[in-house]
Structure formats: C-alpha cells, structure tokens
Amino acid sequence: MINIRKTHPLMKIINDALIDLPAPSNISSWWNFGSLLGLCLITQILTGLFLAMHYTPDTSTAFSSVAHICRDVNYGWIIRYLHANGASMFFICLYIHIGRGLYYGSYMFQETWNIGVLLLLMVMATAFVGYVLPWGQMSFWGATVITNLLSAIPYIGSTLVEWIWGGFSVDKATLTRFFAFHFILPFIITALMIVHLLFLHETGSNNPTGIPSNMDMIPFHPYYTIKDILGALLFILTLLTLTLFSPDLLGDPDNYTPANPLSTPAHIKPEWYFLFAYAILRSIPNKLGGVLALLLSILILVLIPMLQTSKQRSMIFRPFSQLLFWTLVADLLTLTWIGGQPVEHPYIIVGQLASILYFLLILVLMPAASIIENKLLKW
C-alpha cells in the first residue's frame, strides 16, 4: 500500500515540511525559536479572535469594552492577558531568532532573510496598531507621537499624517482603521511565514558550524518534533507564569487611565519591545534625522548579507566577531533601558553613545573584525 502521507496533494506538503524534511543533525536549541514563533502567531490569532468578538472600536466605548472583557466575559481576563503578554513573548522569540541568524550566518540565505525582515516590520506594525486599541492614555499618546513622525517627510508629511488619522487628530476614524489593520495584518503575516518557510526549504537549514551538512541529515520527525514540543511546553509555561502571576509586569500603568487628549502623560513611551528603536529616534535632535535613524535601525538588517566579509559563515570559530556580537546585544539592552528613561542629563548622552555604537558595530566594526580574522587564518 502506498503511504497516503506521501501521495495526497495536501498531506504531501505537510509531510515535506514537518515530517520527512531533512534537517542537520547538529542544530541546537537556538533553532527552536522558528517553531515557537509559529506557536506565538497561532496563540495571538486565537486569543485576538475571541477578544474581537467583544471589543468595540469606538472612542466612547473602546476602553470600557476592554474592562467589560476582563470583568464580565467568561475567562475574558485570561484571554486579554494572554494576548498582551503573548505579544511580549512573540518579540522575545523574534529577537532571539534574529540574533541566532546573525550569530550563525543564516542571513546568507538571502531570500529567507529578507522575507524575515519584512515579517519583523509587519509584526512591529501589528503590535503598534494593537497597542492603540485599549484606548488608554499611553495608547492615545503613543499613536499621536508615532504617527506624527511621518510629518517629518518633506512636502507630503502633514497631508500623509492627516490621511492616516482620518481627520486633524487621533480620533474615532483612527481607532476604527487601526482595528481593521490589527485584524488583517496577522493573516498577511501567516502568508509571509509560509513563503519564509518555502524559501528556507529550498536551501535547507543552516547549522551551528555554518558548513554544508548535506552528507549528515536526519528526518525532522521524530528528532526535531520532540525537541520542538519541549520548546513549546517551556514557552507555554513561561507565558502562563507571566500571565497568571504578574500580568501587568510589562505593561504601562498609564494605560489604565482612559485616553484624554487634554492631559499628556509625564513620559510617553511605547511597549518595552520598541524601546531600543525609540531610544535611537530620541537620540537625534532633528525630527527627520531621528525618523531616518529609527527606520535604518531596523532596515540595517537588509544590509547584513552585503556586509559579510568573513571567509567563515558562522561566528563559532571567530572570537573577535563573537565579542562584537555580544557587545551589540549589550548595546541593544542599554538602548532598551534608555528608551524607558526620561529625557534628561545622564540618559541623553548614554543614549546617543549607544545609538552611535549600534550603527558602528554593524556597519564598521564587525566587517573589519571579519577581515582581521581572515588574515589570522593564514598564520
């Protein structure tokens, strides 16, 4: 009898992607985060769907509809907090996944990498519009400040901002369209994720050594399915612990105050996962310059394959590059901390230095270190 798994048109696709897929025998736990991101996406879509059933995208009722979900809907509180903290988990997994790609040279699969950067931008856009929906103080002012940055675009800026707002300020029209975007974007992300996997399966996975492993492959199932299930269980445990013990740990207390256009919060700041980019934005005194630096801080990822000067793909045998990589991680953590601090004396200069170091590391120091390491190979 012919195995239906290998012949059925639909089952065959699933089989080739998740069961009989040849995978390198030496990939470590850092390769778990791709499947965890898929799990994050499913969690967010499901919890988001149930929230959307009870949420009303209207300035007069949005805040109270979220309160209604938490108080009156059966298990509404846990759905709401799973969704909010699920977003944080999503970004933790995303940043680790990107870090893994940088460390082990996975960016050399250029199509996969570029679609990954596009996915990152999409997830960031989704998280931003989603943060506006509860219509608390930080939702309103975050939306006002971030959308206002577009006014820095010469000539069309002001018109563009008013077009996005649907009026002369962030109001009912803005909230309604942000809800529409927040609903549609995850499905676009799902489609892009399939394309991301499609390109990955054209080349096969990279591995920690960065050396082709075609002569030493093992089937994905059962070896990596069991490993992914362990990762998924640890992920679920972390998410549930965060949600049930300290659901507001990563949120902003200001968002428990209904949006008030007449009262500005003392410190306007986005969610923690955007703070590094926010710190880069704030470190440049010029509006247009800040916006360009903000964009470049993410889009610089597209340039990374072009900046590859090393003869080795992975950083596993490159001590100088390793040192610079971990300096970059520390720098991003510093920027995240600075982004959450008020704009005053010690923080301003620290933020500016950290921003300069961020671009310097990626554009100059890492390629230079790779060239030095190439020379050392000849010794």
Swiss-Prot record:
The keyword Membrane applies. It is a multi-pass membrane protein. SUPFAM superfamilies: a domain/subunit of cytochrome bc1 complex (Ubiquinol-cytochrome c reductase), Transmembrane di-heme cytochromes. GO terms for cellular component: mitochondrial inner membrane; respiratory chain complex III. Keywords: Electron transport, Heme, Iron, Membrane, Metal-binding, Mitochondrion, Mitochondrion inner membrane, Respiratory chain, Transmembrane, Transmembrane helix, Transport, Ubiquinone. A ubiquinone binds at residue 201. Belongs to the cytochrome b family. This is Cytochrome b. Component of the ubiquinol-cytochrome c reductase complex (complex III or cytochrome b-c1 complex) that is part of the mitochondrial respiratory chain. The b-c1 complex mediates electron transfer from ubiquinol to cytochrome c. Contributes to the generation of a proton gradient across the mitochondrial membrane that is then used for ATP synthesis. It comes from the Eukaryota. One of its GO terms (molecular function) is metal ion binding. It holds the Pfam family Cytochrom_B_C.
